[in-house]
């Protein structure tokens, strides 16, 4: 079963992919066919009673210096995801 995963983490451009456990989780989730969307905690806000963020589709690869691609941001409610992964 494919899951739709939102991941809250530090800026992905600044991580060291060789030692980052969040990055390892993302690689495995992607390998298993799950959809991944990315946001940083400073972008969270409330819309009524919903927690929302500008989420970006995320593709990761095990290449130092070229380890991710982000899609266009779209403001979405976090309760629409199967999994919300908080990694800080």
Which stretches of residues belong to each language-model region?
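ATP-binding N-terminal substructure of ATP-dependent carboxylate-amine bond-forming enzymes
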Residues: 1-88
């Amino acid at each position: 079963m494919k899951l739709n995963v939102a991941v809250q983490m530090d800026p992905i451009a600044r991580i060291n992919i060789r030692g980052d456990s969040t990055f390892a989780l993302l690689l495995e989730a992607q390998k298993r066919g799950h959809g991944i969307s990315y946001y940083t905690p400073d972008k969270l806000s409330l819309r009524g009673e919903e927690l929302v963020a500008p989420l970006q589709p995320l593709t990761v690869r095990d290449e130092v210096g070229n380890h991710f691609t982000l899609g266009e941001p779209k403001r979405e409610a976090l309760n629409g995801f199967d999994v919300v992964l908080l990694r800080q």
